Design a protein with these regions (language model features):
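Sec/Tat signal peptide C-region and signal peptidase I cleavage site
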Residues: 58-62
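Structured extracytoplasmic
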Residues: 63-212, 220-225, 230-247, 255-265, ...
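Extended interaction regions within the primary functional domain
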Residues: 13, 50-51, 63, 261
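Bacterial N-terminal signal peptides
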Residues: 45-56
């Protein structure tokens, strides 16, 4: 992967956290059981990309606000079950969600921007329809793609795979053994009551990437409704003319679709600080218009 030519940019460290504006997503609302499922929406934030900066060494200083919408953390243990039992139960629900999502089509809208100060100086924007075949294999049909003008960074196929995998991350029973999940407590997030877990990979195998961060699990549905973290490991090449591969922090939310919490919205607002300069990156990813296909479509509408 070749690094982009580096423009003359002033080093900046900006914190541009914002709550969701109209058109960017909707905050989480309390789930009043089946009567209000259709009206619930959640904002969804997060993003992951590969940053190619030839010949520079440095580190990303995450600025994405994981605490947005969070109440005070209550460290008391879960009621009526152990933390391990809670993990087993919500992982089982997540497994159902991952399988269910393969029976839907939806629109994926990816917007990545680089900023110089407060001004956008480049962007990547692509919209695609996502579907799955009978074996659960994912396919995309691009309906809109503008000429990329990003400054100082370069998106690759691996970056788009991050968008497909980690921003809408679903922690299944099969994946749980790969991670250390540490119970952190209970927390009110927007209008939901949740359990909070710290997540980190037990071991990073060569050629594989993992999620590292926190997840918030709805205390009634036992499904993830919010996550904040990044994919790991970062790859920093020390040889000259070799690009750095750094992921920013992202935060994501879900929405209720036919009674299940599906990934809905993702955002990054991060300044990546390198040895010579800093690059401010903003990213918004939306997963919208879920439509069930196949034999179960009629049942889902009932």
């Amino acid at each position: 992967m070749a690094g982009n030519p580096i423009p003359a940019l002033r080093p900046v460290v900006l914190r541009c956290m914002f709550r969701f504006r109209s058109g960017e997503g909707v905050r989480m609302r309390t789930r009043d059981r089946e009567a209000k499922l259709a009206g619930q929406r959640i904002g969804f934030v997060g993003a992951v990309l590969v940053f190619a900066l030839g010949g520079l060494l440095g580190a990303a200083r995450a600025q994405t606000d994981c605490a947005d919408g969070n109440g005070v953390l209550d460290t008391s243990p879960p009621k009526n079950m152990t933390a391990q039992e809670l993990v087993q139960k919500f992982a089982a629900e997540e497994t159902k969600i991952k399988e269910a999502r393969t029976h839907y089509t939806y629109t994926q809208d990816v917007l990545v921007q680089t900023l110089n100060g407060k001004a956008v100086d480049g962007q990547f924007h692509e919209i695609a329809t996502v579907s799955y075949d009978n074996q659960g294999k994912r396919a995309e049909k691009v309906s809109f793609a503008e000429q990329p003008t990003l400054r100082g960074i370069q998106l690759t196929a691996e970056d788009m795979d991050d968008i497909h995998t980690f921003m809408p991350w679903i922690l299944t029973t099969e994946e749980v053994p790969q991670y250390n999940l540490t119970y952190a407590g209970q927390q009110h997030v927007d209008d939901l009551d949740t359990y909070v877990f710290h997540v980190e990979p037990k071991k990073e195998e060569k050629g594989k990437r993992y999620f590292q961060g926190r997840v918030w699990v709805d205390n009634h549905d036992l499904q993830i409704v919010k996550l904040c973290g990044k994919s790991v490991p970062d790859v920093v090449h020390v040889k000259k003319r070799q690009p750095m591969n750094i992921r920013p922090m992202f935060v994501g939310y879900r929405q209720v679709v036919d009674g299940q919490w599906f990934p809905a919205y993702a955002r990054v607002d991060d300044t990546l600080n390198f040895q010579v300069q800093a690059i401010h990156v903003r990213e918004i990813v939306k997963f919208t218009g879920y439509k069930r296909v196949g034999a179960g479509a009629a049942a889902a509408k009932q």
